[in-house]
Amino acid sequence: MAAKAIQYNIKVDLHEVKDLSFREAAGEKEIVPNPYIEVTVNGVTKTTIQKTQVVSATFNTSFNFTAYLTPDEFARSYVEVAVLHKYMLIGGVGLQSAVIGKYVFSFAYVYTKSQHWIYRQWVTLRNLDQPQDETGLLLITVGVFGPGDAMPVVDETVCVVNEGERTSTDVNVKLTHYSLSVNIFKGQDIPSVAGQFSTVLEPYVKVKHGGAELQTRPLPDSNPDWLASISIPACVPCFDGNVLVELWNGQDSSTAAGTLMGTVVLDYFQLIKNDLPPRWFNFYWRPPAEGLLGAVTDMMASAELREPIAYGGRILLSASAAKVQTPLPLGVRSARPIPDPATQECVWWLDLYEMTSATGYTSELRIEIAFGPHVIKTASLEANALGTYVIGDNLGRLPEMKIFAPVDEVQVWDVMMYVCSPPATTVAAGIADISNWFSGWGGSPTATQNTPEPAETPWTRLAWVRIPYDSRQFQNGKPQWYSLRSLDGSGTDMFSVLLGMEMFPTKAGKQRAPRLEYKLARFYFRALIYEGLHLPAVGYDVFPDPYIQVELASKTLRTSTIRQTLNPSYYEAYEIEIRLPENISLAPDINVEVISESNSLLSSDVVLGSVQYPIQKVPKEWTKAPVWLQLHSKAYPRCKARVLVAFELVPAEKAEDDTYPFYDDIRPSTKEGNIRLFLVGVRLFKPITQPFVTVCFGRDVENTAEPLWSQESSAPRTGEGGNWNFLEEFTVSVSLPKRMQHHSFLEVKIQDRTQGIGGESNVDVGMAYITLNPLLPWLDSRERAESLETFRLQMLEEVLIEDAENARRSADGGLAARTGGGSFDEDATKKKEMLAAERSRKMAIPYNDPDMANLKIEEVDDYVSFKVAPRPQASRLSREGTSRDERGKAPGKSLSGMPGPVARASPGAGEETEKKGDPVAEKKEGGAQAAPPVAPSAHQREALAASPEEETYGFTPEQLNFVLADLEEDDAEEMTRDEVPYELEADFTVDDLPYLRTPIFRPTDAGVPETVGYLKYVCRVFQSTDEDEGAEMDAVCKSLIETYNSTRDLVVRAYVLAARGLVPPSGASDIQTYVWIQDSENAATLPGGLSYNIRDTGYTKKQGFKPEFNRCYTLACSLPENSIVQIAVMNMGRLTDECIGRTYLDVEDRFFNKKVEQMVIEESTPIELRTLKNEGSTVSHGSLRGFFEIMRADYAQLHPPYTLASAEPDEYQLRVVIWRVKAVPLDDNSSISLFVRTIYQLEDSSEIVKDTDTHYNSTDGTAVYNWRMVFDVLIPAQIPVLKLQIWNYALLSSTEPIGEANFDLTADFFRARKRQQHYRVPRMWVRCSHPAHKGKLRGTIEIEASILPREEAEYTPVGNGRDEPNRDPFLPAVTTNRTYIDWQQIGETVGAASSAIMSGLKWTGVWMTVAGIIALVIFVMFLLK
């Protein structure tokens, strides 16, 4: 069956581009581009902002896409990323764009990766029109996530450059070039396509890989000879593992679109290892419906109606990937003809024995069997008196067919078998013939030789099955039953055919064996139907009305219908006489279907699931326990439904003489049991007004919609919204099964009384099942544990997560198989690098890293140590200054108020933790010191916690002659806080709570129910009514009532740190997020400032899909009214706000959980990751990171909330000093004029551009500036990168950059913000590069910087350039090379020339010159007189 379309979320994070190289055509000069990035997924394109005249740029932009794809569509889908150049006019007016380079990620390849994503990967951009050029690098993250896949959250500090590496190092992505060649030789048997106005036959082949798409020319022939070789430049590493070969018929036009006949997916990495020799690829398709109405029907068809059902031809192709030094150009070339793959003459024998109909079809039928282009048809078949089509020797033994088939088994066609009904014209003609015969007009007309035979009218195909070719199966000739599925898209199996096939080479000389004797004998078939379990629902809030139908050899048995349940109990036995082959191995298997009965004339029954039981396993007498059979549902593949059944098959004579008697009473043996149910309450995700609960057991035999016993609760004692406490006990004595195989349970219906126009009405809210099997006292512990797992109802969320884990395991297995034979997968290396970076992580931590959001980073030299010193105890700050032990004690009670002492974790005796390593910090180049040892792992932290004496490396203040500032206690606390990558509830066990809980669910159209709340209860089953047996339960119930009476004044603290991987349902990319947290709809503020509902719209974060909140929300809480805390991440819109995702936190469970209570006391509540979900969506919409506490109000008053680092940006001033430039190449010029440009991008994507003055006419590539630049910045910053560029100032020609570098200030910003004081970036040289001169130094810039809080900067201002105030540091004036015309140099040149002239003259010439000058003076004086 064709799978349904599945929702996928695609995340693309664009981090950075580097070394862009753009030229309009090959051989032309490179130009500095104006880059921007386009990302296209499934026809949807999203674009980043444009940068101006840069070859490297930081984007830090995220895009989300949502797609609904079938597996075939998923295999063909990809993410296409294109970096483009925007042509600009003077004044910033944009013109057309040109491609700089592209990259493609196929969905299938990304999904095979761990966690279904590729994280921060440098890829080489390529322009396939100029494959020899490497047009730049792109740092990108791509993820493809399906149902149940969690959004990955990583420690981003691993991937951030460390101190001493502020400028991004050269990225060396070494490409190995390949020439991918796909040779398309010819096609055969390609059918024409019936269009709306004409029939189209223009087949061609299209090849796609790595963003390239080429095709052969279309040829109007069903057997075209293309002889085309498609060449695509390819490389490794590559993230498009697919080479798609598509067979199309008809070109796209204004009136019609081309028809995709089929797709072949070649493995690119396998082609690198081994060439694909010429071979046939067979295509199968579903012919489109004819006419305009048919076209519309095809567009709206379900996946079932798009599944291929017919042979669509084949193509002969070969493929290879040859390593080359330089990539070859893209193109389609001629290919030499080659001989066809080897074939052999084969003999095909077919024997049909019987056909049965599961739908009671008894009209005239015919069977057609197609083997590629070869088709064989039976004569028309008539049903016998038993309603089956027994095919005798004359019609069943089909004539021998000789076929030339490929020797290679994988190239042989599959077998397609159809059941067809006669066309209407044939039926009418048959009626006319019968009428003529009766009226005397009949007779056999004599056909003349000149009368042409009329063309056969095709019969209508009703059902089909595709049988993959298997030489072992096709050579044994053993008959098998095949189920044929309906062609109407319903997915039901209409017919079953017993067919024997045999195929072997003619040269084998094998003689056809006699046809198996097919005689029917009488049997009595008995079906024992017990129960159904976890059947799928038939829609939202619609329970099924299931009955079970058993079919064998066209005989059908049907049980009664049990109304409105997922767990029906039947206990019905049926016996029927049936005729089966004497050779029982030829009999069909038993088909069991569970069907929901329709209640309307306008709808039909719905098949919930089916299973086949082998007839050969059925005994004459079933003596063992009945078996649970797993149902397979085509409409509900995620539902794990089962049926409990048994079967017997007795020869007629053995049944009729009572050798094997039939018993119709199959009810299980029982024991009397007393059920006590203490209903604590209901916890719903949505509010209701007047809830009540009905507890039911069993079903009435006469009216299965009514329970055998039921009792309605009284009004709830306390509660509001969706949380209500009943604290009421229900007692009933019933008969319960002895054996664990039979399911025994209570049904609990939750309803709400509402007032409407018509009066009072009851609205169904949800249903809960309480399984009694684990509570039965006569079962042993193993049976209880097994029955608990067997009868546990899986919710939609659990099923999705389990499916995702299975897919991950399969993907990991496939990945291991793929990487086992080659070295093209870089995951292993990348993981090693990330682990190594994690182990050696230094203190250069980004400000926006959630793991380090509340840490204070001190200078490394503060931790230099030469001996081991005792580590001080860290605890939360207390306003009263009480000790940790004092604060851990609540007056008379624990935090939850339950009786008993507060549990304390005693240190393990005799356990010591040794810390090994060199305590002396090593010096690095540039004066930077090595980082302190990395933080211990979770396992190490446990060992440290259990150690009686904790040790750390560092001086004690007494050992120093100065004051050592220790870490703040708040920060030290956060450093030791554990983190779990899941929701904390996953660690809760049944024994952690004083009550049990089961999901309250509602049916969904996926078949699997979804959770709408929880039912909390205490339940016991007793064999007697002895009061001593119930003493334990009485004590538990009494304790719960007392505790709830004292839980009116509680406090919930929700520390919401950050959100990651947000996926807005609207697909918006520019989002402003805030937190909405509530445990009640009541938004009023209580005395003392607490509230039940906080919509934090005044604290919006415009940080994209990774906002930092670092907010502590304190909510008032009373149990049970406020048991469920809803935390939603909202996107603030212009008109309405959008809920991105929400998570529900059951604080009541945490209040009663002793382990969680101890965590609060010990201040060790771990940070957890909670999945954000949205109603109507089955995929994750992101993750919320935080930790959560619940406590009594008096305890909260003694223990203030933790102080979290603010996530609001602070105003700072960045002061950058450009000292000098050196090593700038002259590029064949005698001199060069240089200036330095700095670019800083603000939050609104605008840029601050500042230039130094110009150093003119440098003859050695050096320049001096002593120039200060001042930037007002916000920390945290979205892009904390300062771009440095060296420019050539040209008076006549255009000014252009010589080299550039990105100066990453992430770690410096983080440190400056943590210190809240003046922070200096040491003086250093920054190397510059240019993509047009790969691997060459294009100059270095000597730079120094400092970062100050805005208040301090205003107190100690400095001037730009060398303006006053000129301080910190003082910048000396520069006077040389500051004018374009150097007059001093000109004077020196003239003087030198004069000296040269004078030294060459003789004394005679000198005296003559002097005399001439004197005569000239006298002449001037004479004139003046």
Swiss-Prot record:
Gene3D superfamilies hit by this protein: C2 domain (2.60.40.150)
Gene Ontology BP term (one): vesicle fusion to plasma membrane
Keyword Repeat applies: yes
Protein name: Ferlin 1
Membrane association type: Single-pass membrane protein
Record has Transmembrane helix as a keyword: yes
Top-rank taxon: Eukaryota
CDD domains named in the record: C2, C2E_Ferlin
A cellular component term, taken from the record's GO annotations: endosome membrane
Matching InterPro entries: C2_dom, C2_domain_sf, C2E_Ferlin, FerIin_dom, Ferlin
Alphabetical keyword list: Cytoplasm, Endosome, Exocytosis, Golgi apparatus, Membrane, Repeat, Transmembrane, Transmembrane helix
Similarity annotation: Belongs to the ferlin family.
PROSITE patterns: C2 (PS50004)
Disruption phenotype: Attempts to generate conditional knockouts failed.
Domain called C2: residue spans: 1-123, 161-281, 506-629, 1032-1160, 1192-1319
Annotated source species: Toxoplasma gondii
Pfam families attached to this UniProt entry: C2 (PF00168)
